[in-house]
Structure formats: C-alpha cells, structure tokens
Design a protein with these regions (language model features):
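Conserved N-proximal alpha/beta basic substrate-recognition cap immediately N-terminal to
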Residues: 1-20, 25-26
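Short, charged, surface-exposed secondary-structure boundary motifs
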Residues: 3-6, 27-30, 47-50, 152
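Glycine- and other small-residue-rich loops at beta-strand/loop junctions that grip anionic moieties
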Residues: 19, 80, 142
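Phosphate-binding site of ATP-dependent enzymes
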Residues: 24-25, 32-38, 42-135
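ATP-dependent carboxylate activation and anion-phosphoryl transfer catalytic cores
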Residues: 116-199
C-alpha cells in the first residue's frame, strides 16, 4: 500500500479490501476481520508512518490512536499481502495499454528486472484505462502486488529520477510502442494551430 494513492482507491474491484477512516474503533474492527493489516495516514509520503497492525497485539488500541492522530486524521488500511515478499510490479501504460513492466524486489533482495505483462496485469490495465484516459492521464505507472492494484503513478516521475531502475530500457520499450503508432491518440483538427506567420 502507498499512502496517498487516491487514484488506486477509485478501483475497489481491482485492489485488496480497503478501509479509509479516522475512527479508531473502525480500524480495530478491520484489523480483527483481516488479522494483519498495513496502515498509513492519508496524504503521507510513500513509506512514511506506515504501521503493521496485528489483531493479537495488546497495543492495538494505542496504535490505532497513533495512525489516526486520536481520531482526527483519516488512515488507509489494507490486509497485509503475503505476495509483498516477492516485490512489486510497475506496469507502464500508454492510453490504457500496457507497454512495459518492471519487477521491484524487496529491499536488499536484488536489482529490479524487466518482466512480462501477465493476463491479470492486462485485466487491471483494462479496468483502469477508461477513467485514466477520461481524466487526461495518457501515461501512467500501475503498481501491483500479486493480483492486486495498490498504487497509480500518474506523473511518470519514477522514470525521470537519476538512477531510476532500468529507466533507459523501459523508455526504449515505450518509445518503440509509440513509434509503432499503436497507442498514439489522434490529434483533433485545429488542436495544434500553425505558428504565427505561416498561414
């Protein structure tokens, strides 16, 4: 789970069970149902103030108060996914179509590697495509853990960071798909007016 990934929460059928609430009692009930969950305050930085909550932990009431700031701040809760131990997959999409994928193993478990797009990945891409394109998001990165969508990067910033894993390889794959013309959206007539003095 990535705190602040509000886009991913708009597709409940594609992600794990999720609770967004500032009510400590609701949080405790969610933990009781799912046994072990991951919790983070809404709007927090990725990976910051993330807590793992266990229904058998005697400190659970105190931790629920911490993550909600005593009921004054909403938190996002999702069941802990065992597939997390295998790492996350970032599927890069253009106009809703998957064009490249990178698997990021857990910390200290080896480098990121390119991987194939699975049928489940394509199902998730198809489920998010209409909404993303409708909101003008033509390039995005979908973050998956196992069979679940857990985050959406609508900025593409991950490929622009210095030292981003496999950025050249992924960009080359994306460029190849774009140059092939498969995912280029048609430009409406008049959308790109001629420069002054050329008419």
């Amino acid at each position: 789970m990535r705190a602040g990934d509000g886009l991913a929460l708009r597709f409940p059928g594609l992600g794990p069970p999720t609770l967004v609430s500032a009510d400590p009692a609701a949080l405790r009930a969610f933990v009781a149902e799912h046994r072990v969950v991951v919790a983070a305050p809404v709007g927090g930085c990725v990976g910051s103030r993330v807590l793992r909550l266990d229904r058998h932990d005697p400190n659970l009431p105190h931790l629920a108060d911490i993550v909600t700031a005593a009921g004054t701040r909403a938190a996002v809760l999702q069941p802990y996914l065992r597939e997390t131990t295998a790492g996350t997959t970032r599927v890069h999409v253009v106009d809703g179509e998957p064009v490249a994928a990178v698997r990021h193993p857990p910390a200290d478990a080896g480098p990121a590697v390119t991987c194939r797009v699975t049928d489940r990945d394509r199902e998730i891409c198809a489920g998010t495509a209409p909404a993303l394109v409708a909101h003008g998001i033509h390039f995005a990165g979908l973050d998956l853990i196992g069979r679940y969508l857990v985050g959406i990067d609508a900025t593409g910033a991950s490929l622009g960071r210095p030292g981003a894993p496999l950025a050249p390889e992924v960009c080359a794959e994306i460029a190849g798909e774009l140059l092939d013309g498969t995912f280029l959206s048609p430009v409406p007539a008049g959308a790109c007016p001629a420069p002054a003095g050329t008419r």
